[in-house]
Regions:
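Aromatic-lined glycan-binding groove of carbohydrate-active enzymes
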Residues: 2-57, 61
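Mid-to-C-terminal alpha-helical segments outside catalytic/metal-binding sites
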Residues: 2, 10, 20-21, 45-46, ...
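Short leucine-rich amphipathic alpha-helices used at interfaces
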Residues: 58, 89-90
Length: 174
């Protein structure tokens, strides 16, 4: 429908769906866009000008954000393709499958290899920018409650994985 072309400042936030699906979905949408734009769609007929000037992936990188609730390392492996600045971490609290009460362990497991800048972005700075949060006002709370990079950069030892958890955050297989 071209809504992002007509409204380039519109922001669309998809939550509770993770982000692992994004690269393949955008690749398929771009392929369909290219086929429709070139007329190579077999027996289907599309009106002239039905496609947007740019492929769907262009608008996704410009307008879309992904709420990665209870993200695991496999969930974030393609973060550079998606755009780290487009990913918003969420604990999924108070849902049964959320990270609580093992949130700090989940954060260490998921983000220890992401690097400090990417981790800070996904854990809060992206949301702060998107929603125009006052970071100075939030700093005392963050300093008191938030985990440090020194804490998050330490991988979990095998004996630290929670035994009775319902979150996907500790998933290690693709």
């Amino acid at each position: 429908s071209g809504v992002f072309h007509r409204f380039p400042k519109l922001k669309y936030i998809i939550t509770e769906s993770g982000c692992a699906w994004v690269p393949e979905t955008l690749q398929r949408l771009d392929m369909a866009w290219k086929r429709i734009s070139s007329g190579a769609v077999g027996e289907f007929q599309f009106a002239e000008g039905v496609t947007t000037p740019e492929p769907p992936s262009f608008y996704a990188k410009q307008n879309c954000y992904y709420g990665a609730s209870s993200a695991s390392p496999p969930e974030l492996k393609d973060r550079d393709v998606i755009g780290t600045e487009r990913i918003l971490w969420g604990s999924d609290y108070p849902h049964y499958e959320g990270t609580y009460p093992d949130t700090r362990l989940a954060l260490r497991h998921t983000f220890n290899t992401c690097g400090e800048d990417d981790t800070r972005a996904m854990l809060g700075l992206n949301a702060a920018k998107l929603y125009d949060f006052d970071l100075e006002a939030l700093k005392p709370i963050s300093d008191k409650c938030g985990p440090t990079w020194d804490e998050l950069s330490v991988p979990l030892a095998p004996d630290e994985f929670p035994k009775d958890t319902h979150t996907n955050a500790f998933r290690t297989l693709d």
